[in-house]
Amino acid sequence: RFANGVLRASDAVYNLPINEAAPYNNHIHGFLHKRAHEVIEHDADNNCAWVKTRYVYDENDEFFSYLPVKFTAEYTFTLSEQGLELNVRFTNNSDVMLPMSLASHTTINAPFVDGGKEEDIRLTVPISKKCELNDRCLPTERLKSLTMYDLEYKNGAKCPVLQVCDNDMYVGETGELDGDNFHGVIAEDAASGKKLCYEVSDEYKFWIIWNDRGMNHYFCPEPMTAMIDAPNLSLERDVTGYTEVKPGDTFETHQRFFTKLPAVEE
């Protein structure tokens, strides 16, 4: 979200269309998910299958009048015994700075295990601070200590459905999986012990959790490289996560879904 559609970069101010109506009056979600991306490569072998897509953003895109910064977006999806991996690359093709605040509206079905029950789902999100949001779902710039409600995420006790999780936004940190460092979230079916693990690269510094009022059989642990409205905040960039890509440079992130099954006793 960008308040009032304004995006303040270091070298320009862009006015994006407001597509989140009053009382919010924000620009939300961007436009890339509404574009047809070209498949430029696909193949499969005994180890994996992959597909690579590309979208070239330039003056031919109707959004260019709002954000006249040329770039290329490339997505590579790889499916193997290591899980489902997504590599994202944004290359700045312009002669000005490319504002970068990347997020995924990741959605997980509930239940996610055959025969599972929604009430058995537990979500672990490694977090350190709560990012307070106002009534327009914009940061107040206050980072708050975790309450008992918030600690349910950190301690793996949060059921992310059957109750409202409405834009719970946090500063992320590195957690643990099987004794190793793990930068991501873990959804577990407590009845079976089966885990769905969602690993993200270190560029993703924040998490926001949303579940569409909790009764629609899905939940969204959404990784973000920057806070909501990050370029417009007065906080330092090392706090907000906002960054800019120089002309000719590339910004790259990585995500991976994989499963963990409970150990089988012999």
Please describe what each predicted stretch is.
Residues 57-62, 66-67, 118-119, 126-136, ...:
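Surface-exposed, gly/pro-biased binding rims or lids
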Residues 8-13, 40-51, 78-83, 112, ...:
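A short, structured loop/turn motif at beta-sheet edges
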Residues 97, 107-201:
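Active-site/ligand-binding surface loops and adjacent short beta/alpha elements
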Residues 18-81:
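Extended, loop-rich substrate-binding clefts of extracytoplasmic carbohydrate-active enzymes
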Residues 1-8, 236-237, 242:
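Short acidic, Pro/Gly- and aromatic-enriched capping/linker segments at domain boundaries
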Residues 194-266:
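Active-site pocket scaffolds in enzymes
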Residues 55-106, 111-113:
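Acidic, contiguous internal or C-terminal segments within carbohydrate-active enzymes
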